[in-house]
Amino acid sequence: MQYPTISEYVKASQDASDNLDMSTEATNAELNEAIMDEFGVKYSKDGRKLLKAPQNLDSTYSIKEGTKIICDMAFADCKSLRSLVVPDGVTSIGKRAFSDCTSLSSLVLPESVGNIIGNPFSGWDGELKCLSPYFIYDNKVLFDKDKSKIIAFRDKKTTSYVIPDYVTSIGNGAFYDCKSLRNIVIPDSVTSIGDSAFEGCTSLTSLVIPDSVTSIGDSAFDGCSSLTDIVLPDSVTSIGDCAFFLCESLISIVIPDSVTSIGDCAFDYCESLRSIVIPDSVTSIGDGAFDSCTSLTDIVLPDSVTSIGDWAFEGCGSLTNIAIPEGVTSIGDSAFSGCESLGSLVIPEGVTSIGDSAFRGCGSLSSLVLPESVGNIIGNPFSGWDGELKCLSPYFIYDNKVLFDKDKSKIIAFRDKKAKSYAIPDSITSIENGAFYDCKSLSSLVLPESVTCIGDYAFYDCKSLSSLVIPDGVTSIGTWAFMGCSSLSSLVIPDSVTRIGDSAFWGCGSLSSLVIHATGAGIVDSVFKGCKSLESLVLSDGVTSIGDSAFDGCSSLSSLVIPDSVTRIGDCAFSGCTSLTDIVIPDGVTSIGTWAFSGCTSLSSLVIPDSVADYVNWAFRGCSSLSNLVIRATGASIVDRAFKGCRSLCWLAIHAKIVIPDGVTSIGDDAFRGCKSLKSLVLPESVTSIGDKAFEGCSSLSSLVIPDSVTSIGNCAFGGCRSLKSLVIPDGVTSVGEDTFSVCSSLTNIAIPDSVTSIGDWAFSDCSSLRSLVIPDSVTRIGHCAFSGCSSLTNIAIPDSVTSIGFYAFSGCCSLSDIIIPDGVTHIEERAFYGCNFSNNLKQELISRFGIEIFW
């Protein structure tokens, strides 16, 4: 039979699908409009693409019929997934689609698959069966149908491999994470090495790249930490981004004259690399190309180089000498930052631009001259460097160790590290990025009314700065502007400020009083993080959001009024505010982020308004004093770990129970885990799912009604609910998962509906008060240790539908003296009835059918 080529196949598929999108990427737009099935798997709204599966996807899953594309990373890290069915009809599978599905035992590629992007199977070692005529699977290696391209090398135990000489291309991620592979032979037929081709091959010690290879992809040898040396042939013209990133043992590499570009981070963290010669063909050194090459002592840059990228040699602490070629016109941000052994450096005439922090921390560099050609300085290139500076450029003024622009309207670098006080001249309108960086002696500073802008990290780590008045004309305070100003005790932010950058006051540990008059600035991410002395705070009306980690670790903050204008409270916004006793969330708030109030150990009461549409994982975790909770939000879900560890949580306002309002559809994983004082709970009819460990450890919970609307109860959902006496599982539930009711030691009876087909491992283990139980005819499997330790169980009927009983299933059921095992049971595992009080006759009967191992 003559099969079409892959390109012909894809074209035909496109024609048949009216040129619909064939991309394996799951776009944000698609994810936002996605349709979620009952297992939490997201599909595109037209059903053609499987976009993303949740990482907690468990047991068995069948991809829906009609699916054409399995997107990149679709099932990545689904570590509990044991079985997956890919239907015939799927045509494309994206990169790393099944990566790290460590419990998945096998997978079948159906005939319809004609397009595979990269290596979908990286980090997965299960059995693969290929039915597609467009690929060949031979000795654990997946090739295209012509065997010209290696797609996936899957023999993770092999220490050496010879690539066949008919292979011309090593695909993206083909040998990804083959940690046992020490030696590999690449034949002369190979012309390209793809992105991440050998990434994570930590045992690979040596490699010869043949003359036929012309390109080395991004991250091709990323993380090959045992690779000591490599020779690149003259045929190679480019070295991709991060190509040798984290090759920690790489001592030497020869770059041929054919190479014209060295990618960003190409040799980043090659900590053993001592010297390197860059050929005349190279014109640019990419961003981070030799970042953190801590053993690099010598490097020769050819005259052909015209630009040195950002962080190009950052952290090269052993580099003693480098000559910047005459042709270089730009030196990037942090280009030589942290080159602490660099004794001398000449900036050639011709350089026109120098980036921020370019020479930061060059402690051995005694002097530096700015040539006449320099007309553009970004931020402060000299932060953290105390050597002698001479300025020849007419575009700048260097006066009394302060570098200004030529008009003296901007302070670029304040370099008098011994100064304790300074009055900024009235002509200054802008304090540039890093201008006063690390001025540890500066305790007093006067800002004139003329200043309108305070740049990023302008006063970073000015540890002695104790007082500062921000003038009314300032409109912008940059990112990290006052970060680490640990002596700053009070501050007023005027209403002229329209922008405050992220982390602007992070680590201002002495800041105890703060007034924010600015209404349009917003409370941005990490802005006051770690301000551990901050006791009070006034926020003006007009603030609309409180950013991620905005007040994280403000351990002295006892009260705060959030203005009505706020609509969003970000992730970790008040995490670790251990003195915060009460807070009012205004009615306009629609979103409360992950960990938002986690660790607020003094918070005793809380009202969640009905405007809240979503509060997410861990939002109130560890609020150990929270005893009063009012949830008015009707459209939200009680999501993963929302109230985990709220051990004082027991009642709502006047009621002696927590009332979850109508409209809530799901109780997430760990939502109320560890709420030891929670006694009773009412779940509304709107709830359809209860997540893993949702009520685990709620040891006082004695009363609960699960509504008929619930179809899914997660693993260990009620584990350790020692006071729970009775429970009815609604008809829609199909399985009782692992540990779902384990250690419910007061549970005397439970009703299992006919809809349940399996009873999971440890499902009712150590339910020591459970006396009798009816297992419905729908159940086919009783899991491992399912009823182990049910010491009061005297009577149980196993239906004809059951075919298997797991090991230790009824071990320790010392009151169980009789049982009837139907003929349909074909397999009982070892010690299933260990410790049961059966008569000798019954034991002999069961031993004759299933072997003595079921008792021992």
Q: Which residues fall in each region the model found?
A:
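Structural signature of tandem-repeat unit edges
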Residues: 1-42, 48, 53-69, 78-92, ...
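Consensus positions within tandem repeat domains that build extended binding/scaffold surfaces
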Residues: 71-74, 94-97, 119, 151, ...
